[in-house]
Amino acid sequence: MLKTNFKFWRRAFLAVAISAQSQVFAANSDSGSEYPFVFHLIQAALWDEAVAADKTYFPPTYRQDGFTHGTANPDKLLTVANHFYQQTEGDWYCLRMTTESLRASGVTVVFESTAPVGDQPPDFEGSEDELYPHIMGGISTGAVLEVLTVERGEAGEFLRIHGLYPGE
């Protein structure tokens, strides 16, 4: 009897898990379709170091967060940058990728609600308006289509990402 109950509950658990997983994959397959790119804001020195060493880049909060944060909506980039990274000094880049270029490099992109970056909560205006691409691994240099420069003000505020929009 105990063996029969175990088999029943195991099957029930697997059925629920597979169903939930299918729903997540289905939701994620359409989530980023409105925007063709996945962007990642990165300290220039860290990216330059990864490129020079021909290594995959992992952000400083990767171990804590479990993924690399991204943004699909270009209109959200400066808001995200100013919320999470304004206090971090130095030059920054914005990496332009696609889910396909990331997948070709061996990582999956999952569109989910916002999540903390390290210990910084995602409580910026509009944080709950859309799903954000979470890159389930590091970023290889081959996954990046373009490296955009970021302009910052004297107080560290992020002002502009050069070349973000066509015709700039």
Residue ranges and their predicted role:
Residues L2-A12:
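Bacterial N-terminal signal peptides that target proteins for export
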Residues R11-Q21:
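Bacterial N-terminal signal peptides
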Residues V24-A26:
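Boundary at the C-terminal end of the N-terminal hydrophobic targeting segment
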Residues D30-E168:
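Conserved, structured core segments of small domains
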